[in-house]
Amino acid sequence: FKLAPEEALGAPHFLMMGLNQETNGSYYRWDVSYSVSFPTRWERLKANIDLALHRVLWMGPGDLALHEAKKALVNFNDGTFAWKMDGGERFSISGGPVFPTEHELIWSTALQALWLGVLGGCLLYAFAAADRNSVTLWLCLLGVMAMVMLFECRARYLYANVPIFILAAVLGARSLAARVRGR
């Protein structure tokens, strides 16, 4: 396996893809075809930046805000993190002895409830007393959120950072418990 830097799709490609309205900022085959149609890395970077700016200007502030709201739903509304969806169905664990198909609804509902609890805990953490550690954790959370809101949204990008969200949620719940005990 040999890396080919000249053929790489850089950050502007993923920014451009994150601004496509056709798939609410998710993978879009046309964007990939467009990017790889440029023979050099610099031509590709310039074309991606130009198209990203064109999309922002074409949407305007109102449509851009609506687009980002849709991306927030794509990124944060699924506690299963696009289980069995992201990347096609090349591999499935349902229908086997661990996750029989008839329990899929229960499984996905439980995961959704857990994820909503984690997001709720993060919200509680937002109102916790700030210290040096909390600022560091908030910077991590904001960085992850900015990444998935600016660039292509895929469940795997958020899923890789779930421990950060869980830590913030636990600290948020702990802060709430301390406030309740203090009253």
Which residues are covered by each model-predicted region?
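Short, aromatic-rich membrane-interface segments at the entry and exit
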Residues: 133-138, 156-160
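Membrane-interface junctions at the ends of membrane-embedded or membrane-associated helices
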Residues: 127-135, 169-183
